Amino acid sequence: MEFPDLGAHCSEPSCQRLDFLPLKCDACSGIFCADHVAYAQHHCGSAYQKDIQVPVCPLCNVPVPVARGEPPDRAVGEHIDRDCRSDPAQQKRKIFTNKCERAGCRQREMMKLTCERCSRNFCIKHRHPLDHDCSGEGHPTSRAGLAAISRAQAVASTSTVPSPSQTMPSCTSPSRATTRSPSWTAPPVIALQNGLSEDEALQRALEMSLAETKPQVPSCQEEEDLALAQALSASEAEYQRQQAQSRSSKPSNCSLC
């Protein structure tokens, strides 16, 4: 006697047996008999969801817990950086000693990355003020502005000390008069920041630097070197001309029979 209303048929296409005590697959939620309830027996397509494996640290052979959906490589890497007790991991931990001070971040870096506003240490991902919610006040001077200010300080220090070329008497020849360039005194560095923004101060410093690099009047030593070079060139040309004349005036020893 059959009871078609009792139990359920096996979902395996090759079986379809009526089982009074059917079993439900916890992966694909299919109904199967006792012979096909295993994942491998009915070729379950959702068996990978139940195949949970715990990765093992390759250095200390300790199982590393991994949250669902998290890549195991990331969990193993964080374990090596923080909790691994092996010698290579501890040696690496001594190198990466600069811990990020942002809340919730455990990244460590080899060098310090200090914020210019709050003077705190952060990792590469959180080094910008917007990435770590910087609480520092004020707008810091950029590196270009600092470089321009340092150049202006160097120009101001060198312009106050008289150079040896200014103290020496000018050697002017009667046929050639040299003009002395007017002395230029750089304004103090404080004037760069007095009432000027950072961009204006940078532009002012660049103009001062370009003014310092203008070509100067040649010195006496340069004029003497130039005259000596011209004299040597003229003597060489005269010697070659005399040699050419002597060769042309020399009689030929060849005779025709």
Swiss-Prot record:
The modification Cysteine methyl ester is found at C254. Residues 153-187 are annotated as: Disordered. Phosphorylated by MAPK14. Phosphorylation has no effect on association with the proteasome complex. A lipid is attached at C254 (S-geranylgeranyl cysteine). Zn(2+) 4 binds at C115, C118, H132, C134. A zinc finger (AN1-type) spans 4-52, 94-142. Gene3D superfamilies: AN1-like Zinc finger. It is a lipid-anchor. GO terms for biological process: proteasome-mediated ubiquitin-dependent protein catabolic process; protein targeting to ER; regulation of insulin-like growth factor receptor signaling pathway; SRP-dependent cotranslational protein targeting to membrane, translocation. GO terms for molecular function: K48-linked polyubiquitin modification-dependent protein binding; ubiquitin binding; zinc ion binding. Zn(2+) 2 binds at C25, C28, H42, C44. Zn(2+) 3 binds at C100, C105, C123, H126. A motif (CAAX motif) lies at residues 254-257. The keyword Membrane applies. The modification Phosphoserine is found at S163, S173. Residues 255-257 form a propeptide. It is found in: Endoplasmic reticulum membrane. The keyword Repeat applies. InterPro entries: AN1-like_Znf, UIM_dom, Znf_AN1. PANTHER family: AN1-TYPE ZINC FINGER PROTEIN 2B, ARSENITE INDUCUBLE RNA ASSOCIATED PROTEIN AIP-1-RELATED. This is AN1-type zinc finger protein 2B. It comes from Homo sapiens (Human).
